[in-house]
Each structure stands twice: as structure tokens, then as C-alpha cells.
């Protein structure tokens, strides 16, 4: 194993942002992608130092066993397709990091815990705004407390958009939310629920009023593991509302389960052009509320700037720590592995109730 970091999907927005932060930290990089011209452009923006690797995902993974990098950072979506494929291809001693918030992808990586531990590897899934932000608030609320009876987490990202296509990673997350009939934890079991259920309006510490609804996301799994609560709801401001929720959303899961429809939907959304624009609000927010059988309740917030910036910072911090030998072998979410302080290291600020 060497100390190189392979960044898969290095020409996408998230991949570029992570690569820049790692390069500025002096980490030896291999930029991985399918388009030589775009990879060369990314490398030129970093000073031309990184090594480039062109090819399909399959050919890239075939080369892992020979090169044995220190860490592989996966930003290639949809993660439900790529996450386990990439993690399984990592040779003994090579660590894995992704930025997914897709529930199946998070489950797939966590299911590789024994494989990772046996190989002396650390697999970290959800090392971005999705998963880490809400997970870290809940971990803070539950520190030195017995398991709560009920928890709810809400993610409210505010991100600036650059000109270009949506991209496969974000498209995969969107389709993952739309294709699910909903999930929640009820009586300690992961169960199906109505699409876009549990609506709420939250007033953030700076006075914004934001609407959220529950969905199937990696945040749900992370919140369940962080709290061990019997009832867990994970909600997001990304879930549509209004007439779309009432009439269209309930039918989408069945449509997207038709063979071949889901990849077509991901591909179509990934190609949608978007215009450059500033983020709509100054802050992104993650919120958590926990209630105990005694009647005690606590809630807290994590304040973040741009959600994309936080994702890049979080993935970079996790990668840096793995290169330094931190983290126990196995598969985990970032907050569970490194504690809620990881969110602060990535630029977040906690605002918590005081018991």
C-alpha cells in the first residue's frame, strides 16, 4: 500500500472540490475519469502534479490490486450501483470513502464490515453533508444518554450551483428518493412508509422557515445506528411538496421499478443543464430532535455554509485521517467512526439545547 489517494469521478464537481483540498494538503493524487481532456483540465488547475488514469470504472478497478493506493474516494454515482463494486475491489490495506446519501448504498457498504475488518481496511460511507450533518447533531444529543424512544433528523442544504449538467451522483440520489415508497424505523425495525410523509415546518436559528418531509436516505440508517431509538424518521427539504406529492409521487416507485426505467431516469436527470446561481440561503442546516421515555426531549442544529463545500471538506478530512492510520478497521458512517467533532473539523457549528 502507498500513500496515494485515487479520486474516482475527478472531473465532476464534488470530485474536483475534493481533489483540490487534498492537493492543497500535499496528498499525492491519482485523478480518475473517462475523459482525458477534462482530466487534464482538472490537473492543470491543480498545478499539473496529479497522476491521471483514464478508462471505464471496470478497467479502473482492475488496476487497484496492482497500485494498492492508500485510499479510494468514490464520487461516481449512482452509488447504489457503484459503492459496493468499488469497495469490494479495494485490495487488502486500501481504505474506501464515498459521499453517498442513498439508503441502499449505505446499507451495502455497512454490510461489508467483516470483509473490511479482515483486510485491515476502513470503509466510510456518507462522508458528506448527507449522512454526516444530521448524524453528528444526533450523536451530540445522545452523548452520555440512554437510547431515546424517538428521534427525527432533518437535512436542509443550501448550495450554490455551477453551470453544467446535474451529474450522475446527484441524479442517483434524486431518483433514489423518488423511487422509494418511504422508509422509517418503527418499533426497532426498518419498515416502508408513505412517500413524503411526516411533513414539518422548522424555524432555523436564523429565522428561516423551511419545510421538510421524510424519505428513504442514508441519513435514516445513520440516525438509527447513532441513537438506537425505536422510532426514527429522516426528513429532507429535497422531497417535493404540493400537488406533486399528493398525485404524482405515490405512483413513481412502481414506475421506477420497471426493468430499465431507473437507469434511464438517472441518465436523463444527470444530463439536465443547470445555470450558475448563488445558494438560496446563507446557511445550510441539519436538525435533530430526540425524545426519551421519561418525557425529556432535546434538539439541536448544525450550521454549515454551502452544502457542497461541507461535503468536500468532510470527505477530505476523513481521507486525511485514514492516511494517518486513524479509524478502526471495518465499515462505518463518518460520525460513528470519528465522532461528532468531525463535523466541526469540516466547518460546521453546533447549536444545542442545554439540559
Description of each model-found segment:
Residues 251-355:
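C-terminal active-site/capping subdomain that shapes the small-molecule cofactor and substrate pocket
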Residues 65-66, 80-98:
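Rossmann-fold NAD(P) dinucleotide-binding segment
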Residues 8, 143-299:
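Active-site-lining helix/loop region of Rossmann-like oxidoreductase modules
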Residues 45-59:
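Rossmann-fold cofactor-recognition segment
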Amino acid at each position: 500500500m502507498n500513500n496515494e489517494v485515487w479520486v474516482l469521478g475527478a472531473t465532476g464537481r464534488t470530485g474536483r472540490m475534493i481533489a483540490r483540498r487534498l492537493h492543497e494538503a500535499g496528498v499525492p493524487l491519482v485523478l480518475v475519469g473517462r475523459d482525458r481532456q477534462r482530466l487534464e483540465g482538472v490537473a492543470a488547475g491543480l498545478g499539473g502534479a496529479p497522476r491521471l488514469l483514464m478508462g471505464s470504472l471496470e478497467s479502473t478497478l482492475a488496476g487497484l490490486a496492482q497500485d494498492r493506493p492508500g485510499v479510494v474516494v468514490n464520487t461516481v454515482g449512482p452509488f447504489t450501483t457503484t459503492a459496493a463494486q468499488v469497495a469490494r475491489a479495494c485490495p487488502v490495506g486500501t481504505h474506501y470513502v464515498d459521499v453517498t446519501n442513498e439508503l441502499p448504498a449505505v446499507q451495502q457498504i455497512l454490510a461489508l464490515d467483516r470483509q473490511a475488518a479482515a483486510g485491515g481496511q476502513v470503509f466510510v460511507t456518507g462522508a458528506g453533508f448527507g449522512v454526516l450533518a444530521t448524524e453528528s447533531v444526533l450523536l451530540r444529543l445522545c452523548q452520555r444518554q440512554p437510547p431515546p424512544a424517538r428521534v427525527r433528523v432533518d437535512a436542509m442544504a443550501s448550495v450554490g450551483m455551477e453551470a453544467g449538467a446535474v451529474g450522475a451522483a446527484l441524479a442517483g440520489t434524486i431518483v433514489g428518493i423518488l423511487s422509494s415508497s418511504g422508509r422509517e424505523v418503527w418499533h426497532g425495525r426498518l419498515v416502508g412508509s408513505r412517500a413524503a410523509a411526516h411533513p414539518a415546518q422548522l424555524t432555523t436559528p436564523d429565522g428561516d422557515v423551511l419545510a421538510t418531509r421524510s424519505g428513504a436516505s442514508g441519513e435514516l440508517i445513520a440516525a438509527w445506528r447513532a441513537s438506537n431509538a425505536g422510532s426514527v424518521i429522516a426528513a429532507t427539504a429535497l422531497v417535493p411538496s404540493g400537488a406533486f406529492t399528493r398525485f404524482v409521487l405515490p405512483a413513481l416507485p412502481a414506475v421506477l421499478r420497471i426493468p430499465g426505467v431507473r437507469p434511464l431516469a438517472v441518465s436523463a436527470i444527470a444530463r439536465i443543464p443547470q445555470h450558475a446561481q448563488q445558494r438560496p440561503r446563507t446557511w445550510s442546516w441539519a436538525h435533530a430532535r430526540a425524545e426519551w421515555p421519561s418525557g425529556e426531549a432535546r434538539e439541536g442544529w448544525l450550521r454549515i455554509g454551502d452544502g457542497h463545500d461541507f461535503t468536500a471538506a468532510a470527505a477530505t478530512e476523513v481521507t486525511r485521517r485514514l492516511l494517518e492510520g486513524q479509524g478502526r478497521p471495518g465499515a462505518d458512517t463518518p460520525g460513528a467512526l470519528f465522532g461528532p467533532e468531525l463535523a466541526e473539523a469540516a466547518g460546521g457549528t453546533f447549536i444545542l439545547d442545554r439540559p
